[in-house]
Amino acid sequence: MEPLHAVMLTVSLFVLTFFNPGANLFVVVQTSLASGRRAGVMTGLGVALGDAFYSGLGLFGMATLITQCEEIFSLIKIVGGVYLLWFAWNSIRHQATPQMPTLQQPISAPWYVFFRRGLLTDLSNPQTVLFFISIFSVTLSADTPTWARLMAWAGIVLSSVIWRIFLSQADRKSVV
């Protein structure tokens, strides 16, 4: 696969995850509704930092794995592809709305409380790391150059920040 195609496919698959409600989406929206837009932005930036960490770990850890042991990488590609198919199937099949946890921080907490909430929500979500490994095992190869990996990482981080800031606007009244 051409490096730019790999970058576009990697970022596109990540962006598709935005439309599947999960813990990261709910923590940003809930915080925005309960504590305001600024708190939601800080929570979203915490989630985006978690995405940056896991995607970087996946992108560059996967590169090491690819070069060291092709058999393990082939197994990860198969398992990753099956996981992505299972994830898509369950997303289509189950349209239930998860329960949102109750907000435990006071409404007027310092910025770092909200940032930490977003970061810990993302880092404690095992689905995040599994999804990144699955995406990278399908879209990257041993030949994918470092610049393409860096572009994919930057695209993931940028799209994560933009999406989380968009979600933090939940406290505003919708305009039809």
Regions found by a protein language model. Give the residues of each.
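Juxtamembrane transmembrane-helix termini in multi-pass membrane transport proteins
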Residues: 2-74, 134-152, 156
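Membrane helix-loop-helix hairpins that form the core translocation module of multi-pass transporters
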Residues: 5, 38-114, 170-173
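Alpha-helical transmembrane segments of multi-pass membrane proteins
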Residues: 17, 83-91, 137, 156-160, ...
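Transmembrane helix irregularities
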Residues: 19-20, 123-124, 162
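Selected transmembrane alpha-helices and immediately adjacent juxtamembrane segments
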Residues: 118, 122-127
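Transmembrane alpha-helical segments of integral membrane proteins
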Residues: 160-174
